[in-house]
From Swiss-Prot:
Residues the record marks as active site: K98
Name this polypeptide is given: Thiazole synthase
EC number assigned by the record: 2.8.1.10
GO biological process: thiamine diphosphate biosynthetic process
Binding site residues for 1-deoxy-D-xylulose 5-phosphate: G159, A185, G186, N207, T208
Organism of provenance: Anaeromyxobacter sp. (strain K)
Amino acid sequence: MADTWSIGAHAFTSRLLVGTGKYPDFPTMQRALAASGAEVVTVAVRRLDLSKKGEESLLAWIPKGMKLLPNTAACFTAEEAIRTARLGRELEMGDLVKLEVIGDRRTLFPDVEGLIQAAKVLVKEGFTVLPYTNDDPVTAKKLEDAGCAAVMPLGAPIGSGLGLRNPYNLRIIMETVQVPVLVDAGVGTASDAALAMELGAVAVLMNTAIAEAKDPVLMAEAMRAGVEGGRKAFLAGRIPMKLHAAASSPMSGLIGS
């Protein structure tokens, strides 16, 4: 039986979501996206150059069959994010939107108040909202209450590659909300992706870790394996951590005893 997951009316098999920024060129991006096995690819609406057509357009290099997830990157107010989400829908990218309202240009941490404000408006307009948020369980719950279809807490600052800095809060978020939790931002390597899945994340979204790797295509394959391995480990159930050793074989009935 396939291990599927869903957001709103959309169902997926791959638990790795990928981005389109920072690649050295479009052909490399295309090969990496294909190697990742991802079904969802996020695109920054404000950074799309609509004047470019054919092979000059980023959209032309996205593998066929991938679901577009427009995002509101580079929006610093709720109003900007709302307008950008509407533009994405007008461009026929669908009702899914990765909602970003940035509060600080240096850290790219989210503006929580603006995020919740924008989420409420977009939910009322029929969008399936996936908000990029901090790792605060209280904020995650407020976003769920606002009608968001999922929450996407950061593992670390965007593009930092620091890995999951606060796995404890991520775990609390997963226990607090009923909607899917996707870890977004900060992943640096495959073990980070595996850890996110082992904690119980429904999926992981990343861009820089693949795009800026020395070999983006190989890293995409590694991230795919990391996500799949972490998911299997979560389903299998890890053994409890113990302070002292526990022998694998019985200590009684030993030869010579």
